[in-house]
């Protein structure tokens, strides 16, 4: 399977709210006021590089595998993951925000990626629908469109309705790792992924954000125990500690299947 096709981008009129951007031969349509992932792309550095460092330093084979990206945002990881899995692998990118999903699809298309599959779906612990914050995408203020959470009730002006599914509903092939960054909804994603995790035993890259977990009736401690109960060892990137209770920080962790711990992984 050839995973890359040729795309030429023609800009006929400047749009103030969405800018085309090319860096290192990668193409992106970006909200210039998005101050998180977008700013890293514009400045030319890789967002959360320790995920890729972990895979590289531990010589983890990704070619021909599946990568699952839950909370795909604008596709910056999807583009990078596409090159990791190569012609024989697939990247499955899930993004519940309708407008950001369109952006994700556009960036996948502009880079000519045939091995990335995009889904406008909220991943959780059940099959149904979910309500999600609808930020002001026309705002000229600095914002973080990745900092959007699922809500308990519908508000016509402030929320969108999106389908919710579990990861276990999908038929993946040889999953090497799953990235989960869903603003406090990580425990629910894991509940709906038990069979997928049991079958593939992938590495997990999980975001711990205490105040968002508390809003979802969980915590860093509870999330860590939930992952350990699945047969994983939780290690925190960068500082070498698993978690920091009531930290108020956003903590990114790598979760290693306990049966692979003897490999003495290097954690960046």
Please provide the spans of the model-predicted regions.
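Short "lid" loop at the C-terminus of a central beta-strand within the Rossmann-like core
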Residues: 97-100, 122-125, 210-212
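Core alpha/beta nucleotide-donor-binding catalytic domains of modification enzymes
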Residues: 105-137
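Hydrophobic pocket-lining residues within nucleotide cofactor-binding pockets
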Residues: 72, 123-125, 182, 208
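Short, charged, solvent-exposed linker or helix-capping segments at domain edges/interfaces
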Residues: 40-41, 130, 140-148, 262-268
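Short internal loop-to-helix segment that lines adenine-nucleotide cofactor pockets
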Residues: 44-68, 131-134, 145-200, 212-217
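S-adenosyl-L-methionine
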Residues: 1-114, 154-157, 233-241, 245-268
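Conserved acidic-Pro-Pro-aromatic motif
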Residues: 16-17, 89-93, 168-268
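Short, hinge-like loop/turn segments at secondary-structure boundaries
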Residues: 109-111, 133-139, 220-225, 253
């Amino acid at each position: 399977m050839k995973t890359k096709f040729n795309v030429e981008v023609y800009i006929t009129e400047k749009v103030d709210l969405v800018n085309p951007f090319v860096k290192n031969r990668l193409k992106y349509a970006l909200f210039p006021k998005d101050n998180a992932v977008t700013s890293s792309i514009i400045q030319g550095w890789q967002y959360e590089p320790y995920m890729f460092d972990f895979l590289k330093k531990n010589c983890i084979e990704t070619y021909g595998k599946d990568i699952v990206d839950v909370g795909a945002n604008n596709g910056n990881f999807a583009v990078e993951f596409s090159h990791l899995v190569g012609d024989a692998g697939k990247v499955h990118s899930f993004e519940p925000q309708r407008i950001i999903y369109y952006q994700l699809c556009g960036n996948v298309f502009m880079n000519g990626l045939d091995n990335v599959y995009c889904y406008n779906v909220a991943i959780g612990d059940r099959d149904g629908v979910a309500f999600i914050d609808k930020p002001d995408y026309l705002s000229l203020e600095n914002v973080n469109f990745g900092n959007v959470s699922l809500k308990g009730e519908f508000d016509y002006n402030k929320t969108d309705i999106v389908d919710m599914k579990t990861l276990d509903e999908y038929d993946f092939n040889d999953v090497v790792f799953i990235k989960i960054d869903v603003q406090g909804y990580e425990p629910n994603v894991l509940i709906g992924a038990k069979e997928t995790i049991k079958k593939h035993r992938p590495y997990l890259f999980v975001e711990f954000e205490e105040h968002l977990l508390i809003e979802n009736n969980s915590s860093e401690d509870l999330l860590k125990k939930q992952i350990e109960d699945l047969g994983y060892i939780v290690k925190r990137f960068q500082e070498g500690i698993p978690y920091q209770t009531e930290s108020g920080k956003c903590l990114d962790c790598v979760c290693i299947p306990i049966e692979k711990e003897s490999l003495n992984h290097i954690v960046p």
